[in-house]
């Protein structure tokens, strides 16, 4: 590993520990030339995953896009930033386990909806309204019915 200050490639490991819930190894190193101490992380390299879009195009899987979309759905809820990142990490793990190299964007959307339904009902409704392109109140009502198992009369009295 190259020292960030003197560019020497000789260093010794002072300490190693598991990081990122076991997905990486954090190593504390010391340069043998200048004695500068620095930290490195070692992770398993994964194959890039292509997302097949509805229009037929492909793009590389981008975890940040999921964080952004889910963060919008979770605004003004009790879902913390850390919980969102943990949630996205779990979605990413499922994608890596379930797919070879390609996954449809619709599959990612359904994984997110399935997870949000368990985690936060408000975020689920918000995400579903964008993902499923709700056109009006009827779409919200039918989603609320499926979420709560309520009758139309009960929901109509609420609305």
Swiss-Prot record:
Pfam families: ATP-cone (PF03477), Zn_ribbon_NrdR (PF22811). GO terms for biological process: negative regulation of DNA-templated transcription. InterPro entries: ATP-cone_dom, NrdR-like_N, RNR_NrdR-like. Residues 49-139 form the ATP-cone domain. One of its GO terms (molecular function) is ATP binding. The keyword Zinc-finger applies. Coiled coil: none annotated. Its cofactor is Zn(2+). It comes from the Bacteria. Binds 1 zinc ion. Keywords: ATP-binding, DNA-binding, Metal-binding, Nucleotide-binding, Repressor, Transcription, Transcription regulation, Zinc, Zinc-finger. A zinc finger (unnamed) spans 3-34. Belongs to the NrdR family. Negatively regulates transcription of bacterial ribonucleotide reductase nrd genes and operons by binding to NrdR-boxes. This is Transcriptional repressor NrdR. It comes from Prochlorococcus marinus (strain MIT 9515). The gene is nrdR.
